[in-house]
């Protein structure tokens, strides 16, 4: 593949060769980072086949760049966790983007850790099973290994009181009310919310109810 453009809103990165941003002695590429404000215009000029988006974690935050890609018929792939299956968390935005993508003849999709370890690995094992009565999973990862968007979504740096008032404020909310809060955009669910939707869609299952609890973990040191 050939890199034809790179965009960022960080003023400290604009104008630098992408190799400087990558670091670790990466060879000179010859492509300078441009201001993200110019993405729409430059996308039309460059006409890339694919746009890789590695910025934020919700579809609402990526609506603008997704719209730009669809407008220019550019396939977009992103590490945005919600984008793997946003139909059960941001249905209105997703339907809008889906329509734009079809009109533009392109694909907008989310990939990454989720689609393998929380997705296809599960469906592959399920497909080899004669009978399934329950699927249970656990996942651990170091928030520091990822970007600021993931850290914010997990409440990193918040006090217990702040966490309970923001992220954990709906822990006791009934399933039907939680569904309304999520789909209206008033509350951003955990990544597992979308993952459950993805798994059920792949296994031809219908979600009757879904709840979540966000419990803070505090370092004892």
Residue ranges with predicted function:
Residues 78-79, 108-111, 136-137, 209:
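General beta-strand structural signal in soluble alpha/beta enzymes
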Residues 9-11, 56, 80-84, 113-114, ...:
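Short, ordered loop/turn segments at secondary-structure junctions
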Residues 20-25, 95-97, 126-128, 153-155:
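Short, hinge-like loop/turn segments at secondary-structure boundaries
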Residues 61-63, 67, 71-72, 80-106:
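Rossmann-fold NAD(P)-binding glycine/threonine-rich loop
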Residues 104-132:
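Adenosine-phosphate binding glycine-rich loop
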Residues 46, 64, 92, 96, ...:
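Conserved active-site and cofactor/substrate-binding residues in soluble primary-metabolism enzymes
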Residues 127-221:
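Active-site-lining helix/loop region of Rossmann-like oxidoreductase modules
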Residues 1-71:
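N-terminal glycine-/serine-/threonine-rich beta1-alpha1-beta2 phosphate-ribose binding loop
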